[in-house]
């Protein structure tokens, strides 16, 4: 076997073994052995080993000792083998010393220069321990405990220890040798061979560790490069797609696919409407026709009743007019399902309205002032029946359902010297005056027939913005819920035959109505009134047109509001006069202003109106759609920098005609940032639109956006160009709170205007009694802002205010004078210093007068 050195560990109370002598200088004889992969030498003298095993010298009871600590092991090159009792013969177990075999190749002098491998393999150790236990158990089974003792005749050539206790003699009776069987020996040899094979495998695996480490470092480097490349792609904005983390995307070019032609064939499928679940169109139309016929019959009955009442009234002569009047044609055409009524208005003083309509044909009435003695001659054609009606004397409760109202006007003037239209110059001669005077007596309106709309003596068109028809209809519509809107037809190109044709269309109730209006030479904003409505609307049962007799009763309650709305929508009177050739050519060059409300906007407005009246009338989805539509259309119209004030005004009139609540809601509607139309208009310095919004009377001027600024505060960003702009912001300041603070920094409109150097805005704010001593969150005042930014003129304006206090300090304890000195504005500092000296000189007098002044203020 290998050279074995038994070292006994010293235990307390036990004398330690003698130290082994030093190795002789002469190299000992190396027995026939083999070197293991880890530097161990195994004795291959199997004959002697087998002989020892047969004699039982190697089989003895050895107590399994714990592995010694590293500190108690001898230092030096080599490897410890803690369980070599089965490999080294004649190991004494009676001394109870822990025997360790020090079989390292570096222990010997001839192998000291070679590189050794440190450590031990626990798997080999466990294998050897198991083999030793099995041999001991098998040997101890027949003999009992303590029967296994080494033989004195055993081979001791492998023991090198000196001073060890002598082996126990065989005749001592401590143990009885039991020769092992051949199977045990074969089993031990197999275990040793398997342990060697496992050692070789482990050694090969250890050799692969550096290669794997190199591969790992290469993969880590590739990962780092890919991570950098991915980050660069994200930075450049390339979409990463839906790939997972660590997944690579390889863009491989693909061969272009051949275009595939698909044959298509249209296939028609016959489906019945009732199978699709669609409503029956014919049934719905039949129901509408029945409703219209019923309304028509009712209107005809009321018309006949009105004619009967008119026949009972005494006739009354009409005095001749002394002022220009307007001749209007009222035509009632009877049809199976529809009634068409044409009417227009009179000018000048308040005139009288015809009280009855004939069931067949139409009547022509002349409206004039009460002064005069003769009535103007009137004529009719075979399609028109003319009647001069007296003034109404009694009120009636007639209700007329009107679906379509058209107004036709001709501008003609023969008495005032204006040129007549060519078509009117060739009119046929009128009837005699006597035939005309006989009409009031008969009260039938029968006169000879002539061409339609023929007039013997054209009269001048009156310069009037609103008609009696609008005044009566508007008053009644405000109460009965009638809303109408005018549409202007295109004018002929001939300026001599200037003609204006207006059309009132509709009586409430359409699902998707449409507002449309055009502004041309002779009619613009006056076409709108408070009783505007939608086009092609079906009449609702609860809505009705007020009768003629009801109009005077409705006027006292509704006239003030109607007149105010009409005055806002009027243009100068010159636009209604007959234009000359020069005026017509100049007016044709004007830009046409058109207002068209989409069906979606009208439907959304009607839905919001229902919601404002009843919050449970709409679902959440319907409310969201209506709100979004109105918000987008209103912001597109009124919140742009180039918004047209006339279009804004017309929309406001339309919203007011629908509902006052709707007008308030739309004007103050805000976007996602909390900005209303007033915020945007003030920011864009579009003060004509601001004026229209303020004139609506429902604008919330103190409403703050999410940034905490109100429209009054945003005037600091605007530039005032004209005197009208100054008047507009003065009106804005008077309607709101000029001392309101922003929610972010606590600044007021005066501080913002001072910081931006808006002298005009500062003057307007001071004129509206803005407080100059208000402090923001940092304790700064408007005077400190002016001193910091070096606005000398604004500083002078602020110091001119008697209540300006220059001794106020901010959070840092700085006054306005200190701020000016720190900013290097010496002129402003001198102004403040002079003001301070003046204040100090009048301080005693002010102290003496303080009680009197305080009592006077109280």
From Swiss-Prot:
Residues 1-72 are annotated as: Interaction with AIFM1. Residues 148-159, 436-446 have a biased composition (Polar residues). Keywords: ANK repeat, Apoptosis, Coiled coil, Cytoplasm, Methylation, Mitochondrion, Phosphoprotein, Repeat, Transcription, Transcription regulation. Residues 676-842 are annotated as: Interaction with NCOA1. This is KN motif and ankyrin repeat domain-containing protein 2. It comes from Bos taurus (Bovine). PANTHER family: KN MOTIF AND ANKYRIN REPEAT DOMAIN-CONTAINING, KN MOTIF AND ANKYRIN REPEAT DOMAIN-CONTAINING PROTEIN 2. It comes from the Eukaryota. Interacts (non-phosphorylated form) with NCOA1; NCOA2 AND NCOA3. Interacts with AIFM1. Interacts with ARHGDIA; the interaction is direct and may regulate the interaction of ARHGDIA with RHOA, RAC1 and CDC42. Interacts (via ANK repeats 1-5) with KIF21A. Residues 12-23 have a biased composition (Pro residues). ANK repeats lie at residues 621-658, 673-703, 707-740, 745-774, 778-808, 812-842. The keyword Amino-acid biosynthesis does not apply.
């Amino acid at each position: 076997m290998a050279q074995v050195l038994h070292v006994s560990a010293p235990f307390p109370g036990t004398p330690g073994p003698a130290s082994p002598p030093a190795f002789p200088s002469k190299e000992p004889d190396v027995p026939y052995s083999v070197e293991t992969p880890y530097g161990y030498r195994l004795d291959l003298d199997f004959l002697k080993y087998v002989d020892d095993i047969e004699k039982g010298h190697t089989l003895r009871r050895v107590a399994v000792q714990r592995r010694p600590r590293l500190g108690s092991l001898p230092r030096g090159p080599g490897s410890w083998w803690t369980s070599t009792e089965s490999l080294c013969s004649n190991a004494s177990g009676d001394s109870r010393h822990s025997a360790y075999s020090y079989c390292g190749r570096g222990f010997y002098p001839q192998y000291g220069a070679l590189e050794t491998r440190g450590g031990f393999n626990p798997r080999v150790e466990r294998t050897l321990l198991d083999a030793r236990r099995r041999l001991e158990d098998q040997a101890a089974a027949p003999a009992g405990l303590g029967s296994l003792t080494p033989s004195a005749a055993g081979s001791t050539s492998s023991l090198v220890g000196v001073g060890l206790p002598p082996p126990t003699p065989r005749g001592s009776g401590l143990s009885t040798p039991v020769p092992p069987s051949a199977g045990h020996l074969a089993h031990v040899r197999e275990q040793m061979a398997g342990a060697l094979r496992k050692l070789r495998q482990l050694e090969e695996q250890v050799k692969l560790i550096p290669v794997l480490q190199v591969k790992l470092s290469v993969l880590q480097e590739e990962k780092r490069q890919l991570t950098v490349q991915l980050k660069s792609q994200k930075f450049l904005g390339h979409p990463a797609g839906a790939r997972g983390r660590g997944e690579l995307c390889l863009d491989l070019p693909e061969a272009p696919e051949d275009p595939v032609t698909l044959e298509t064939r249209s296939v028609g499928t016959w489906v019945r409407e009732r199978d699709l679940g669609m409503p029956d169109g014919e049934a719905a139309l039949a129901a509408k026709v029945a409703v219209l016929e019923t309304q028509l019959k009712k209107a005809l009955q009321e018309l006949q009743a009105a004619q009967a009442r008119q026949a009972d009234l005494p006739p009354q002569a009409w005095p001749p007019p002394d002022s220009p009047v307007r001749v209007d044609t009222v035509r009632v055409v009877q049809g199976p399902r529809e009634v068409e009524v044409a009417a227009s208005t009179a000018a000048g003083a308040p005139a009288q309205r015809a009280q009855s309509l004939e069931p067949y044909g139409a009547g022509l009435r002349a409206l004039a002032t009460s002064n005069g003695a003769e009535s103007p001659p009137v004529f009719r054609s075979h399609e028109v029946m003319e009647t001069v009606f007296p003034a109404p004397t009694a009120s009636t409760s007639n209700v007329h359902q009107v679906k379509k109202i058209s107004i036709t006007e001709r501008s003609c003037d023969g008495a005032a010297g204006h040129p007549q239209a060519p078509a009117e110059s060739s009119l046929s001669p009128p009837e005699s005056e006597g035939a005309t005077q006989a009409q009031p007596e008969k009260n039938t309106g029968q006169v000879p027939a002539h061409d339609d709309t023929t007039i013997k003596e054209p009269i001048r068109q009156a310069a009037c913005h609103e008609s009696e028809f609008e005044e009566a209809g508007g008053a009644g519509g405000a109460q009965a819920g009638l809303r109408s809107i005018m549409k202007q037809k295109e004018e002929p190109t001939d300026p001599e035959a200037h003609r204006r044709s207006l059309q009132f269309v509709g009586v409430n109730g359409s699902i998707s109505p449409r507002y449309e209006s055009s502004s041309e030479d002779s009619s613009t904003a006056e076409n709108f009134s408070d009783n505007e409505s939608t086009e092609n609307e079906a009449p609702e049962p609860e809505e009705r047109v007020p009768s003629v007799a009801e109009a005077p009763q409705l006027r006292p309650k509704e006239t003030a509001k109607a007149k105010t709305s009409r005055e806002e929508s009027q243009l100068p009177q010159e636009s209604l006069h007959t234009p000359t050739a020069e005026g017509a050519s100049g007016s044709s060059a004007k830009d046409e202003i058109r207002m068209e409300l989409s069906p979606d906007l009208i439907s959304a407005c009607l839905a919001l109106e229902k919601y404002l009246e009843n919050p449970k009338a709409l679902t959440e989805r319907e409310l969201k759609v209506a709100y979004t539509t109105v918000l987008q259309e209103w912001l597109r119209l009124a919140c742009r920098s180039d918004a047209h004030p006339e279009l804004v005004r017309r929309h406001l009139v339309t919203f007011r005609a629908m509902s006052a609540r709707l007008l308030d809601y739309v004007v103050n509607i805000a976007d996602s940032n909390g900005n209303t139309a007033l915020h945007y208009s003030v920011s864009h310095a579009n003060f004509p639109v601001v004026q229209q919004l303020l004139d609506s009377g429902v604008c919330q001027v103190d409403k703050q956006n999410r940034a905490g600024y109100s429209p009054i505060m945003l005037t600091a960003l605007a530039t005032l160009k004209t005197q009208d702009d100054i008047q507009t912001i003065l009106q804005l300041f008077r309607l709101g709170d000029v001392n309101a603070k922003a929610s972010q920094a606590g600044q007021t409109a005066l501080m913002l205007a001072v910081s931006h150097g808006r002298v005009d805005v500062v003057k307007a704010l001071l004129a509206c009694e803005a407080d100059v001593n208000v402090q923001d969150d940092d304790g700064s005042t408007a005077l400190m802002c002016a001193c910091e930014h070096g606005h000398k003129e604004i500083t002078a304006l602020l110091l001119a205010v008697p209540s300006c206090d220059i001794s106020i300090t901010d959070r840092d304890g700085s006054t306005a004078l200190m701020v000016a000195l720190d900013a290097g504005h010496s002129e402003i500092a001198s102004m403040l210093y002079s003001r301070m000296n003046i204040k100090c000189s009048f301080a005693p007098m002010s102290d003496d007068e303080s009680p009197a002044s305080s009592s006077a203020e109280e």
